[in-house]
Amino acid sequence: MSRVGKKPIAVPSGVDFSVKDNVVTVKGPKGTLTKEFNNNITIKLEDGHITVERPNDEPFMRAIHGTTRALINNMVKGVHEGYRKTLTLVGVGYRAATKGKGLEISLGYSHPVIIDEIPGITFSVEKNTTIHIDGVEKELVGQVAANIRAKRPPEPYKGKGVKYADEHIRRKEGKKS
């Protein structure tokens, strides 16, 4: 039995939740999210709690049950609190600056890396080396952060590159002379 799927989701005050034909819409102070789910899963709002139920115990249904509950929980948390990923630039001459609603990053290439404006994402830069990525959709915030990190991932010898703020880089010893 899915333990994740059985847990009810509390709907905080200030968040509106609606389901129509398995299309879930969540509105909150930070924004609105809409997502369509598998039509075999039943989603109900009762007494300020969202419950997710499945029709049977087939392995596919058990998997979808827990996933659906987790995605709805992420939607509710996103419109209520929002999500933030923080990236740190490590290296001489590595710096970032906001450019309009986008981002311009110098990562040691012959040209600056430009990240265009992404709907639903807000960039902020602190001290030229810390990038904050904010948004209501957890998946989108994480994907944008991963795309920026992929422009220059941290290397294991000096640790130079773009890394998550809470990421620990395993360092290697240089060659012995």
Curated annotation (Swiss-Prot):
InterPro entries: Ribosomal_uL6-like, Ribosomal_uL6-like_a/b-dom_sf, Ribosomal_uL6_a/b-dom, Ribosomal_uL6_bac-type, Ribosomal_uL6_CS. Residues 151-177 are annotated as: Disordered. GO terms for molecular function: rRNA binding; structural constituent of ribosome. One of its GO terms (cellular component) is cytosolic large ribosomal subunit. SUPFAM superfamilies: Ribosomal protein L6. Coiled coil: none annotated. It holds the Pfam family Ribosomal_L6. Residues 152-177 have a biased composition (Basic and acidic residues). Keywords: Ribonucleoprotein, Ribosomal protein, RNA-binding, rRNA-binding. Gene3D superfamilies: Ribosomal protein L6, alpha-beta domain. One of its GO terms (biological process) is cytoplasmic translation. Part of the 50S ribosomal subunit. Belongs to the universal ribosomal protein uL6 family. This protein binds to the 23S rRNA, and is important in its secondary structure. It is located near the subunit interface in the base of the L7/L12 stalk, and near the tRNA binding site of the peptidyltransferase center. This is Large ribosomal subunit protein uL6. The lineage of its organism: Bacteria, Fusobacteriati, Fusobacteriota, Fusobacteriia, Fusobacteriales. The gene is rplF.
